[in-house]
UniProtKB/Swiss-Prot annotation:
It is a peripheral membrane protein. Its EC number is 3.6.1.54. This is UDP-2,3-diacylglucosamine hydrolase. The gene is lpxH. It comes from Haemophilus ducreyi (strain 35000HP / ATCC 700724). It is found in: Cell inner membrane. Its main location: membrane.
């Protein structure tokens, strides 16, 4: 039976080894039996360039390479934490990078995939920040900086982001319903799968089904399994 897995918001980092362990277990036990695995952003807690090296990164690269070498496809859509993950990483691991929005035929259902941050248009400050950091010229300049300086800048941005979240209402950090429906209609989709909000749920909207992936924590994972029988969270 053909099976697809969807995950997002693992926020892999050295301070939470249990989450890395859970991911590696998933890669060893479930992923090898899949037709494809889709990682929908914020895979890493932050990513400052494909030249960064660590034990965690090496473990993840090895697991991805082993999976793709076995014939299982692995696709990646960047999130707001790992949008600098690039072609070098993709070549090293065998994953395929996708655009911000990707349309997939999933057992006859037109399914739209995205990280989810682009749907949260009510968070105006974040959307302004996103437009700036996605400028290719600015990214090129940042990646030109020494690795140690990039780490300091990323840590500063992350601290500010955490502080800003405390001052934002929960509503503006969720998707805008009208914009989301418009985007789904634009792609002619019947289903939408996204992450980012950390609010695992299935929403049966008027003309489509919206499936939200949850974030990973030391005590639980959020894995969406889709096969010809339907979908379920593991």
């Amino acid at each position: 039976m053909m099976t697809y897995y969807f995950i997002a918001d693992l926020h892999l980092n050295e301070s939470q080894p249990q989450i890395t362990h859970q991911f590696l277990q998933f890669m060893q036990q479930k992923a090898p039996l899949a037709q494809a695995v889709y990682i929908l952003g914020d895979f890493f807690d932050f990513w400052i360039g494909d030249d960064e090296q660590s034990v965690l990164i090496s473990q993840v690269k090895l697991a991805l390479k082993k999976l793709t070498a076995s014939g299982v496809k692995c696709y990646f859509i960047c999130g707001n934490r790992d949008f600098l993950l690039g072609q070098t990483f993709a070549q090293q691991t065998g994953i395929q990078l996708l655009a911000d929005y990707h349309l997939l035929d999933l057992f006859g259902e037109r399914t739209l995939l995205c990280h989810g941050d682009t749907l949260c248009i009510d968070d105006i400050k974040y959307q302004q920040f996103r437009r700036r950091v996605h400028q290719k010229r600015l990214q090129k300049l940042f990646l030109w900086l020494p690795l140690t300086l990039r780490i300091k800048i990323a840590q500063k941005i992350r601290r500010k982001s955490k502080q800003d979240k405390k001052n934002k209402s929960a509503d503006i950090m969720d998707v805008n319903q009208a914009f989301t429906a418009q985007k789904v209609h634009q792609y002619g989709a019947t289903h939408l799968i996204h992450g980012h909000t950390h609010r695992q749920a299935v929403h049966f909207e008027q003309n489509f089904t919206r499936i939200v992936l949850g974030d990973w924590r030391p005590d639980r994972s959020s894995i969406l399994k889709v096969d010809e029988k339907g979908f379920e969270f593991l």
